[in-house]
Amino acid sequence: MAPNLRKSHPLLKLINNSLIDLPTPSNISAWWNFGSLLGICLLTQILTGLLLATHYTADTTLAFSSVAHTCRNVQYGWLIRNLHANGASFFFICIYLHIGRGFYYGSYLNKETWNTGIILLLALMATAFVGYVLPWGQMSFWGATVITNLFSAIPYIGQTLVEWAWGGFSVDNPTLTRFFALHFLLPFMIAGLAFIHLTFLHESGSNNPLGIPSNCDKIPFHPYFSLKDILGFIVMFLPLTTLALFSPNLLGDPENFTPANPLVTPPHIKPEWYFLFAYAILRSIPNKLGGVLALAASVLVLFLTPLLHKSKQRAMTFRPFSQFLFWTLVANLFILTWVGSQPVEHPFIIIGQLASLTYFTILLLLFPIIGALENKMLNY
Protein backbone atom coordinates (compact mmCIF):
# COMPACT_ATOMS: atom_id res chain seq x y z
CA MET A 1 0.00 0.00 0.00
CA ALA A 2 1.31 3.49 -0.88
CA PRO A 3 2.40 5.49 2.20
CA ASN A 4 0.04 8.26 3.26
CA LEU A 5 1.86 11.55 2.56
CA ARG A 6 0.04 13.22 5.45
CA LYS A 7 1.62 10.71 7.84
CA SER A 8 5.08 10.38 6.28
CA HIS A 9 6.05 13.87 5.06
CA PRO A 10 8.29 15.59 7.69
CA LEU A 11 6.24 18.81 7.72
CA LEU A 12 2.79 17.40 7.01
CA LYS A 13 3.05 14.81 9.76
CA LEU A 14 3.67 17.64 12.22
CA ILE A 15 0.38 19.26 11.14
CA ASN A 16 -1.30 15.85 11.04
CA ASN A 17 -0.32 15.02 14.61
CA SER A 18 -1.50 18.42 15.88
CA LEU A 19 -4.66 19.11 13.89
CA ILE A 20 -5.90 15.98 12.12
CA ASP A 21 -5.15 12.64 13.79
CA LEU A 22 -4.66 14.13 17.27
CA PRO A 23 -6.43 11.89 19.84
CA THR A 24 -8.83 14.21 21.66
CA PRO A 25 -11.10 13.55 24.67
CA SER A 26 -14.62 13.02 23.34
CA ASN A 27 -16.32 15.14 26.00
CA ILE A 28 -14.48 18.48 25.86
CA SER A 29 -16.96 21.36 25.91
CA ALA A 30 -17.03 24.79 24.25
CA TRP A 31 -14.64 26.00 26.99
CA TRP A 32 -11.92 24.14 25.08
CA ASN A 33 -12.51 26.32 22.00
CA PHE A 34 -10.54 29.28 23.29
CA GLY A 35 -7.09 27.90 22.42
CA SER A 36 -7.91 27.84 18.72
CA LEU A 37 -9.71 31.20 19.04
CA LEU A 38 -6.52 32.70 20.49
CA GLY A 39 -4.62 31.27 17.52
CA ILE A 40 -7.01 32.88 15.04
CA CYS A 41 -6.88 36.15 17.04
CA LEU A 42 -3.09 36.14 16.74
CA LEU A 43 -3.26 35.51 12.99
CA THR A 44 -5.83 38.29 12.53
CA GLN A 45 -3.77 40.73 14.60
CA ILE A 46 -0.56 39.94 12.69
CA LEU A 47 -2.32 40.34 9.34
CA THR A 48 -4.14 43.61 10.16
CA GLY A 49 -1.04 44.87 12.00
CA LEU A 50 1.17 44.23 8.97
CA LEU A 51 -1.25 46.17 6.75
CA LEU A 52 -1.32 49.04 9.26
CA ALA A 53 2.48 49.07 9.57
CA THR A 54 2.77 49.69 5.80
CA HIS A 55 1.04 53.06 6.33
CA TYR A 56 2.38 53.99 9.75
CA THR A 57 5.25 56.38 10.52
CA ALA A 58 7.03 55.89 13.86
CA ASP A 59 7.85 59.54 14.46
CA THR A 60 6.34 61.84 17.09
CA THR A 61 5.53 64.55 14.54
CA LEU A 62 3.89 62.15 12.07
CA ALA A 63 2.51 59.16 14.04
CA PHE A 64 -0.88 60.68 14.91
CA SER A 65 -1.51 62.07 11.43
CA SER A 66 -0.29 58.85 9.77
CA VAL A 67 -2.97 56.91 11.67
CA ALA A 68 -5.58 59.53 10.71
CA HIS A 69 -4.37 59.27 7.10
CA THR A 70 -4.77 55.46 7.21
CA CYS A 71 -8.37 55.84 8.40
CA ARG A 72 -9.31 58.58 5.93
CA ASN A 73 -7.39 57.92 2.72
CA VAL A 74 -6.33 54.27 2.59
CA GLN A 75 -8.77 51.79 1.01
CA TYR A 76 -10.58 50.18 3.95
CA GLY A 77 -7.91 51.62 6.26
CA TRP A 78 -10.60 52.53 8.82
CA LEU A 79 -11.80 48.91 8.83
CA ILE A 80 -8.28 47.46 9.20
CA ARG A 81 -7.57 49.82 12.08
CA ASN A 82 -10.90 49.12 13.81
CA LEU A 83 -10.43 45.36 13.44
CA HIS A 84 -6.91 45.63 14.85
CA ALA A 85 -7.90 47.81 17.83
CA ASN A 86 -10.99 45.75 18.73
CA GLY A 87 -9.24 42.49 17.86
CA ALA A 88 -6.95 43.21 20.81
CA SER A 89 -9.99 43.38 23.10
CA PHE A 90 -11.25 40.05 21.79
CA PHE A 91 -7.76 38.59 22.21
CA PHE A 92 -7.90 39.50 25.90
CA ILE A 93 -11.50 38.27 26.33
CA CYS A 94 -10.42 34.92 24.89
CA ILE A 95 -7.23 34.66 26.96
CA TYR A 96 -9.03 35.52 30.22
CA LEU A 97 -11.74 32.92 29.50
CA HIS A 98 -9.02 30.42 28.51
CA ILE A 99 -7.19 31.00 31.82
CA GLY A 100 -10.49 30.80 33.74
CA ARG A 101 -11.23 27.47 32.05
CA GLY A 102 -7.76 26.17 32.99
CA PHE A 103 -8.30 27.30 36.55
CA TYR A 104 -11.78 25.79 36.90
CA TYR A 105 -10.93 22.41 35.41
CA GLY A 106 -7.49 22.02 37.01
CA SER A 107 -5.62 22.21 33.69
CA TYR A 108 -2.80 23.97 35.58
CA LEU A 109 -1.63 20.54 36.75
CA ASN A 110 0.01 20.25 33.31
CA LYS A 111 2.70 22.50 34.77
CA GLU A 112 4.78 23.15 31.63
CA THR A 113 1.70 24.00 29.57
CA TRP A 114 0.40 26.30 32.33
CA ASN A 115 3.73 28.09 32.84
CA THR A 116 4.29 28.71 29.12
CA GLY A 117 0.70 29.99 29.03
CA ILE A 118 1.45 32.57 31.73
CA ILE A 119 4.56 33.68 29.81
CA LEU A 120 2.29 34.03 26.76
CA LEU A 121 -0.10 36.21 28.80
CA LEU A 122 2.79 38.45 29.90
CA ALA A 123 4.02 38.73 26.29
CA LEU A 124 0.50 39.62 25.15
CA MET A 125 0.19 42.30 27.84
CA ALA A 126 3.54 43.79 26.81
CA THR A 127 2.49 43.78 23.14
CA ALA A 128 -0.85 45.46 23.89
CA PHE A 129 0.85 48.10 26.04
CA VAL A 130 3.48 49.11 23.46
CA GLY A 131 0.82 48.98 20.72
CA TYR A 132 -1.42 51.40 22.60
CA VAL A 133 1.37 53.99 22.56
CA LEU A 134 1.75 53.98 18.75
CA PRO A 135 -1.18 56.25 17.70
CA TRP A 136 0.49 58.94 19.86
CA GLY A 137 -2.72 60.38 21.28
CA GLN A 138 -2.97 61.89 24.75
CA MET A 139 -3.74 58.60 26.51
CA SER A 140 -0.99 56.86 24.50
CA PHE A 141 1.60 59.36 25.69
CA TRP A 142 0.49 59.61 29.31
CA GLY A 143 -0.13 55.87 29.61
CA ALA A 144 3.42 55.26 28.39
CA THR A 145 4.77 57.87 30.82
CA VAL A 146 2.92 56.49 33.86
CA ILE A 147 3.56 52.79 33.23
CA THR A 148 7.25 53.08 32.25
CA ASN A 149 7.76 55.35 35.27
CA LEU A 150 6.78 52.44 37.52
CA PHE A 151 10.17 50.87 36.84
CA SER A 152 11.77 53.81 38.67
CA ALA A 153 10.41 52.22 41.88
CA ILE A 154 13.06 49.48 41.55
CA PRO A 155 15.70 50.35 44.17
CA TYR A 156 19.11 51.66 43.07
CA ILE A 157 18.82 50.98 39.31
CA GLY A 158 15.22 52.19 38.79
CA GLN A 159 15.80 55.69 37.41
CA THR A 160 18.66 54.56 35.14
CA LEU A 161 16.48 51.72 33.86
CA VAL A 162 13.60 54.08 32.99
CA GLU A 163 15.85 56.55 31.16
CA TRP A 164 17.42 53.66 29.28
CA ALA A 165 13.95 52.42 28.26
CA TRP A 166 12.88 55.93 27.22
CA GLY A 167 16.08 56.65 25.31
CA GLY A 168 16.17 60.09 26.94
CA PHE A 169 14.80 62.00 29.93
CA SER A 170 11.13 61.67 28.98
CA VAL A 171 8.85 59.73 26.65
CA ASP A 172 9.81 61.09 23.23
CA ASN A 173 10.74 60.12 19.68
CA PRO A 174 13.27 57.36 20.63
CA THR A 175 10.60 55.80 22.89
CA LEU A 176 8.02 55.72 20.09
CA THR A 177 10.52 54.24 17.61
CA ARG A 178 11.55 51.40 19.93
CA PHE A 179 7.95 50.73 20.95
CA PHE A 180 7.06 50.29 17.28
CA ALA A 181 9.99 47.89 16.84
CA LEU A 182 8.87 45.91 19.90
CA HIS A 183 5.24 45.91 18.82
CA PHE A 184 6.30 44.42 15.50
CA LEU A 185 8.59 41.81 17.08
CA LEU A 186 6.53 40.54 20.03
CA PRO A 187 3.61 38.92 18.11
CA PHE A 188 6.09 36.65 16.33
CA MET A 189 7.60 35.79 19.70
CA ILE A 190 4.05 35.00 20.88
CA ALA A 191 3.61 32.70 17.86
CA GLY A 192 6.83 30.85 18.78
CA LEU A 193 5.74 30.55 22.42
CA ALA A 194 2.32 29.28 21.31
CA PHE A 195 4.07 26.51 19.38
CA ILE A 196 6.00 25.55 22.55
CA HIS A 197 2.72 25.75 24.53
CA LEU A 198 1.09 23.31 22.09
CA THR A 199 4.11 20.99 22.14
CA PHE A 200 3.82 20.68 25.92
CA LEU A 201 0.04 20.23 25.70
CA HIS A 202 0.34 17.40 23.19
CA GLU A 203 2.84 15.61 25.46
CA SER A 204 0.09 14.90 27.98
CA GLY A 205 -3.03 15.45 25.88
CA SER A 206 -5.98 17.68 26.73
CA ASN A 207 -7.71 17.71 30.08
CA ASN A 208 -11.52 17.29 30.06
CA PRO A 209 -14.55 18.62 31.99
CA LEU A 210 -14.55 15.65 34.40
CA GLY A 211 -10.87 16.07 35.25
CA ILE A 212 -10.27 12.32 34.84
CA PRO A 213 -7.94 10.45 32.43
CA SER A 214 -9.65 10.08 29.05
CA ASN A 215 -7.32 7.59 27.34
CA CYS A 216 -10.14 5.05 27.13
CA ASP A 217 -12.30 7.38 25.01
CA LYS A 218 -10.40 9.49 22.49
CA ILE A 219 -11.60 10.57 19.05
CA PRO A 220 -9.65 12.11 16.14
CA PHE A 221 -9.45 15.91 16.12
CA HIS A 222 -10.60 16.10 12.50
CA PRO A 223 -13.47 16.28 11.53
CA TYR A 224 -15.09 16.57 14.98
CA PHE A 225 -13.16 19.37 16.66
CA SER A 226 -11.93 21.06 13.49
CA LEU A 227 -15.60 21.70 12.67
CA LYS A 228 -16.33 22.76 16.24
CA ASP A 229 -13.41 25.23 16.04
CA ILE A 230 -14.72 26.70 12.77
CA LEU A 231 -18.08 27.28 14.50
CA GLY A 232 -16.12 29.00 17.29
CA PHE A 233 -14.40 31.26 14.74
CA ILE A 234 -17.77 32.30 13.30
CA VAL A 235 -19.19 32.98 16.78
CA MET A 236 -16.18 35.18 17.58
CA PHE A 237 -15.87 37.03 14.26
CA LEU A 238 -19.56 37.99 14.33
CA PRO A 239 -19.34 40.26 17.42
CA LEU A 240 -15.85 41.46 16.39
CA THR A 241 -17.02 42.68 12.97
CA THR A 242 -20.21 44.08 14.52
CA LEU A 243 -18.13 46.07 17.00
CA ALA A 244 -15.62 47.20 14.36
CA LEU A 245 -18.36 48.31 11.95
CA PHE A 246 -21.03 49.79 14.24
CA SER A 247 -19.28 51.01 17.37
CA PRO A 248 -15.50 50.92 16.81
CA ASN A 249 -14.66 53.42 19.57
CA LEU A 250 -16.87 51.88 22.27
CA LEU A 251 -13.92 50.42 24.20
CA GLY A 252 -11.41 53.19 23.43
CA ASP A 253 -10.67 56.39 25.32
CA PRO A 254 -11.92 59.65 23.72
CA GLU A 255 -8.76 61.31 25.08
CA ASN A 256 -6.78 59.45 22.40
CA PHE A 257 -8.39 61.54 19.64
CA THR A 258 -6.28 64.45 20.90
CA PRO A 259 -2.63 64.43 19.71
CA ALA A 260 -0.07 63.82 22.48
CA ASN A 261 0.84 66.93 24.44
CA PRO A 262 3.46 66.68 27.21
CA LEU A 263 2.22 69.99 28.69
CA VAL A 264 -1.40 68.93 29.28
CA THR A 265 -2.20 66.03 31.59
CA PRO A 266 -5.57 64.28 31.00
CA PRO A 267 -7.91 64.41 34.05
CA HIS A 268 -8.03 60.61 34.38
CA ILE A 269 -5.12 58.55 33.11
CA LYS A 270 -6.30 54.97 32.72
CA PRO A 271 -5.34 52.01 30.54
CA GLU A 272 -7.55 50.01 28.19
CA TRP A 273 -10.29 47.96 29.92
CA TYR A 274 -8.29 44.71 29.87
CA PHE A 275 -5.63 46.14 32.21
CA LEU A 276 -8.02 47.86 34.63
CA PHE A 277 -8.07 45.00 37.19
CA ALA A 278 -4.26 45.15 37.50
CA TYR A 279 -4.34 48.97 37.50
CA ALA A 280 -6.82 48.91 40.40
CA ILE A 281 -4.49 46.61 42.36
CA LEU A 282 -1.55 48.94 41.59
CA ARG A 283 -3.48 51.99 42.84
CA SER A 284 -4.81 50.29 45.97
CA ILE A 285 -1.40 50.47 47.69
CA PRO A 286 -0.38 54.01 48.68
CA ASN A 287 3.31 53.32 48.09
CA LYS A 288 5.10 53.25 44.74
CA LEU A 289 7.25 50.14 45.21
CA GLY A 290 4.47 48.31 47.07
CA GLY A 291 2.03 49.08 44.26
CA VAL A 292 4.47 47.86 41.61
CA LEU A 293 5.06 44.63 43.54
CA ALA A 294 1.30 44.08 43.93
CA LEU A 295 0.82 44.76 40.20
CA ALA A 296 3.47 42.16 39.32
CA ALA A 297 2.04 39.71 41.86
CA SER A 298 -1.48 40.04 40.42
CA VAL A 299 -0.35 38.12 37.32
CA LEU A 300 2.67 36.19 38.65
CA VAL A 301 0.48 34.63 41.37
CA LEU A 302 -0.80 32.33 38.60
CA PHE A 303 2.58 30.54 38.67
CA LEU A 304 1.72 29.35 42.19
CA THR A 305 -1.68 27.78 41.41
CA PRO A 306 -0.29 24.27 40.68
CA LEU A 307 1.49 24.34 44.06
CA LEU A 308 -1.66 25.46 45.90
CA HIS A 309 -3.83 22.63 44.55
CA LYS A 310 -4.73 20.62 47.64
CA SER A 311 -7.81 18.76 46.40
CA LYS A 312 -7.70 15.06 45.48
CA GLN A 313 -9.94 15.87 42.51
CA ARG A 314 -8.55 17.71 39.53
CA ALA A 315 -11.54 19.71 38.24
CA MET A 316 -14.05 21.75 40.23
CA THR A 317 -16.92 19.95 38.47
CA PHE A 318 -17.88 18.04 41.63
CA ARG A 319 -16.63 20.58 44.21
CA PRO A 320 -19.43 23.06 45.01
CA PHE A 321 -17.46 25.02 47.63
CA SER A 322 -14.52 25.59 45.29
CA GLN A 323 -17.01 26.54 42.58
CA PHE A 324 -18.53 29.18 44.86
CA LEU A 325 -15.04 30.51 45.57
CA PHE A 326 -14.18 30.54 41.87
CA TRP A 327 -17.24 32.60 40.93
CA THR A 328 -16.57 34.93 43.87
CA LEU A 329 -13.11 35.48 42.38
CA VAL A 330 -14.67 36.23 38.97
CA ALA A 331 -17.08 38.76 40.54
CA ASN A 332 -14.14 40.25 42.43
CA LEU A 333 -12.22 40.73 39.16
CA PHE A 334 -15.23 42.55 37.68
CA ILE A 335 -15.27 44.84 40.73
CA LEU A 336 -11.53 45.52 40.32
CA THR A 337 -12.05 46.30 36.62
CA TRP A 338 -14.82 48.75 37.48
CA VAL A 339 -12.82 50.42 40.29
CA GLY A 340 -9.82 50.78 37.97
CA SER A 341 -11.92 52.92 35.63
CA GLN A 342 -13.06 55.27 38.43
CA PRO A 343 -11.22 58.34 39.77
CA VAL A 344 -9.18 58.04 42.98
CA GLU A 345 -11.89 59.25 45.37
CA HIS A 346 -13.47 58.17 48.67
CA PRO A 347 -15.64 55.12 48.03
CA PHE A 348 -13.48 53.76 45.19
CA ILE A 349 -10.21 53.79 47.15
CA ILE A 350 -11.48 51.53 49.94
CA ILE A 351 -13.47 49.31 47.53
CA GLY A 352 -10.28 48.84 45.46
CA GLN A 353 -8.23 48.00 48.55
CA LEU A 354 -10.78 45.47 49.80
CA ALA A 355 -11.15 43.89 46.34
CA SER A 356 -7.34 43.63 45.98
CA LEU A 357 -7.06 42.01 49.40
CA THR A 358 -9.90 39.61 48.53
CA TYR A 359 -8.23 38.72 45.21
CA PHE A 360 -5.00 37.56 46.86
CA THR A 361 -6.78 35.97 49.84
CA ILE A 362 -8.98 33.80 47.60
CA LEU A 363 -6.07 32.69 45.40
CA LEU A 364 -3.39 32.13 48.04
CA LEU A 365 -5.38 31.17 51.13
CA LEU A 366 -8.98 30.15 50.56
CA PHE A 367 -8.55 27.86 47.54
CA PRO A 368 -6.04 25.50 49.24
CA ILE A 369 -8.02 25.57 52.52
CA ILE A 370 -11.35 24.78 50.82
CA GLY A 371 -9.65 22.09 48.69
CA ALA A 372 -8.33 20.36 51.82
CA LEU A 373 -11.71 20.79 53.54
CA GLU A 374 -13.53 19.13 50.63
CA ASN A 375 -11.12 16.18 50.87
CA LYS A 376 -12.10 15.83 54.54
CA MET A 377 -15.82 16.00 53.70
CA LEU A 378 -15.41 13.21 51.15
CA ASN A 379 -13.33 11.14 53.63
CA TYR A 380 -10.32 11.19 51.31
UniProtKB/Swiss-Prot annotation:
Binds 2 heme b groups non-covalently. Heme b b566 binds at H98, H197. The keyword Electron transport applies. Keywords: Electron transport, Heme, Iron, Membrane, Metal-binding, Mitochondrion, Mitochondrion inner membrane, Respiratory chain, Transmembrane, Transmembrane helix, Transport, Ubiquinone. The keyword Electron transport applies. GO terms for cellular component: mitochondrial inner membrane; respiratory chain complex III. It is found in: Mitochondrion inner membrane. Pfam families: Cytochrom_B_C, Cytochrome_B. InterPro entries: Cyt_b/b6_C, Cyt_b/b6_C_sf, Cyt_b/b6_N, Cytb/b6-like_sf, Cytochrome_b, Cytochrome_b_C_euk/bac, Cytochrome_b_N_euk/bac, Di-haem_cyt_TM. A ubiquinone binds at H202. GO terms for biological process: mitochondrial electron transport, ubiquinol to cytochrome c. CDD domains: cytochrome_b_C, Cytochrome_b_N. Heme b b562 binds at H84, H183. The chain crosses the membrane at residues 34-54, 78-99, 114-134, 179-199, 227-247, 289-309, 321-341, 348-368. GO terms for molecular function: metal ion binding; ubiquinol-cytochrome-c reductase activity. Its cofactor is heme b. Its main location: mitochondrion. The cytochrome bc1 complex contains 11 subunits: 3 respiratory subunits (MT-CYB, CYC1 and UQCRFS1), 2 core proteins (UQCRC1 and UQCRC2) and 6 low-molecular weight proteins (UQCRH/QCR6, UQCRB/QCR7, UQCRQ/QCR8, UQCR10/QCR9, UQCR11/QCR10 and a cleavage product of UQCRFS1). This cytochrome bc1 complex then forms a dimer. Belongs to the cytochrome b family. PANTHER family: CYTOCHROME B. Heme 1 (or BL or b562) is low-potential and absorbs at about 562 nm, and heme 2 (or BH or b566) is high-potential and absorbs at about 566 nm. Component of the ubiquinol-cytochrome c reductase complex (complex III or cytochrome b-c1 complex) that is part of the mitochondrial respiratory chain. The b-c1 complex mediates electron transfer from ubiquinol to cytochrome c. Contributes to the generation of a proton gradient across the mitochondrial membrane that is then used for ATP synthesis. This is Cytochrome b. It comes from Alle alle (Dovekie). The gene is MT-CYB.
